[in-house]
């Protein structure tokens, strides 16, 4: 463990010049600056423990134990410098038990939630959590943090957090720490975060004693001195001191920049030398000098009587009789000798083969094997020294880069006999596993693939998608045409083949499903005779089914041709199991094989008929499955029966504590991936694969999918098993509306709950809801009492958008949408009135509606009834009922038969709300950042009050817990106003 003190010397060199000689004035300045403080009274010198030792050192955590358990220790500092990828999470450092992995002390960054968490062991053996909110620590930038812990040995301690030299948070009255630290030095283990690509941990130090000013200076931070000094000096001295400190800070910054540059240059040179092919030893052999063919020794004297007929010569050698006997010719090719005796020549000694290729000597001749892998050329075979010298084997390097060895659009480096694949070429992104595709970026105009009329969106893992802007429609944001009614279909056909390139069959009426019953090219939404039977829709008893005779046996409002119960009056046409037979005449409404009269859940399939509480209502549809409530009363419409509804909700997320899977953590969605009864928001291992989500030995690279081996072939920090589908719901992340929630994949309001907000009296009728386009469009046809159509899906953070259109000219009342719905007394509503009007029933109070858009928080003590009805109508606050959070200052009402697009952002964890309205492509209303925490999440839906023929088209929702950037700006402005 390295001990560092502020008095340690530092000498740098630049070229042949000592940096200390050129910058000696800086140390003189430091000496002059510190003199007044030394005169004012010496402070204890800080002890600094470097927790990032070099690889040659081995950290001994036991050395920290006497420091942390020192009863005289009043202050403790932890300083760190690091960089984390955007939205990532990591445990920066921590002390753990090496025997059972329990925590003693730990600091974790949760980038997705913009939080940091400090955990430490209390006296009672439990872990205490200190949460720092709204911190931008995981954004791909280098950050410096300083933790100041005071009086943690005594109790009633405090923690201060400094980020990049600025105090951002403090927490007081903390319980005692470190007293429970084990006395066995071998049982303590120090861990730092596991590095990912593009992450680094540059500095991690523990500092004891010393002042905050002294410790901050270790990070080149010069904070205002908090301790009173014995001799502070005059105001002129303070100004002079601050000026000197500023100069010193700049000087130290130059030193650090110089060091970083030198390190980069050294690393570059080292890597260049290591990879240089020409710098290593050559791999070929020098040719052997030519050798002379030995001269055959003189033939021995021939016996006078020996002739060629005795075959005295070597086989194949020509023999000639002479006067003195015989004469042999030269040895055959591949041999050497005197003609009588011939020996095989080893041609391989003359290196006829390509270097590295095996040469085989034959009798006679030689043979070269095939060229090595990565080379091409002929196999050489021949006889004789001359042939071996003049017919050398030639092997030519194969250029694999021309043969597609690497993926398209990547760098390919051809080497002698081989090749090497590099990264993608400039302008492309990817790797050798996934391929290299054209680099697309929303931040660089040259790499932005989107239409000029489209919005560019950067998705998970850097993917880019395009979405046509408001008032435009087309193919995935690449080709966009004008869209007057904002239903995602262009007014005129576009030059592309996608479905959304076709011409809108109702140009001025939004119909995102493009329904056309008679296939005449005119959509049902704007066709006066939608079924083409010659009878106008207003008189037709089957609007979408051709029936000239208009026969109607049961005399309800639906003709026999389209009536799902021809002999039974059923104006609601409800068909629970979708079998074409209406519930009114279907003896098995839910299609589970059990007749209605015997079925304990007639409208919910449940073959097992389980009924734990024995109240005659099956568990599948029982609002209190463990408490008998045969009447199923649910006054507040929260899907929890009155008999078991406690209305005790500690975290305010809409789920009472007795059923909440995270009672003290906001999680309205109640997502529990591993079904262990603990919600993901408070579960350390969401997928139960043994790899913790965040803490060591994690983080889990597939948090929602079991993968204990953590395979990650491209080292991008995301496991192979969840690379393109993070929640493994069979819908790829690019089109998944909730990529981290397998229970939500697409926008769908086909299943909804109707809530009547004025159930008493007969002033008006209840709303009539019609759902189209597979749950992405809702129509309300009646002039009705206030009412809601609420989806069953609950959300934490959410983005909700849709097109709003009043398709009539005969009324002027309220229409809008809701979010954060928890029960019929608790929800947010955005509502729009066309004209000013006093409600016609003055009981219980006179209610006046003003024109314009209003954002209201409903928290009614009475619930549905005349009080809530008049409070919703009235523009303004009403006691114990409704609060007006924002109103459009233009006081402009909606226009008849005009389409508007709304965008809502709700982040219940911080209370962030913002809603915007567009008319065509023009922004006409913006609430700005509005903060309210009345409802901490909930369900979505639509709202109407005394207004008929409302269309909510092209509805879209998306899970989103990311805090928008303007929230930080809003906080800064708010703090500035408070300071002033």
From Swiss-Prot:
Q: Which part of the chain is the Laminin G-like domain?
A: 43-210
Q: Write the lineage as a comma-separated list.
A: Eukaryota, Metazoa, Chordata, Craniata, Vertebrata
Q: Which InterPro entries match?
A: ConA-like_dom_sf, EGF-like_Ca-bd_dom, EGF-like_dom, EGF_Ca-bd_CS, Thrombospondin_3-like_rpt, Thrombospondin_3_rpt, Thrombospondin_C, TSP/COMP_coiled-coil
Q: Which gene encodes it?
A: Thbs4
Question: Which stretch is the leader sequence?
Answer: 1-42
Q: Where is the composition biased (Basic and acidic residues)?
A: 605-615
In Swiss-Prot or TrEMBL terms, this protein is called Thrombospondin-4
User: Where is composition skewed (Polar residues) in this entry?
Assistant: 659-671
Q: Name one GO cellular component term.
A: basement membrane
Q: Cite the residue spans of the region called Disordered.
A: 596-691
Q: Where is the TSP C-terminal domain?
A: 750-964
Assembly, per entry: Homopentamer; disulfide-linked. Interacts with PTBP3. Interacts (via EGF-like 3; calcium-binding domain) with ATF6 and facilitates its processing, activation and nuclear translocation. Interacts with NOTCH1.
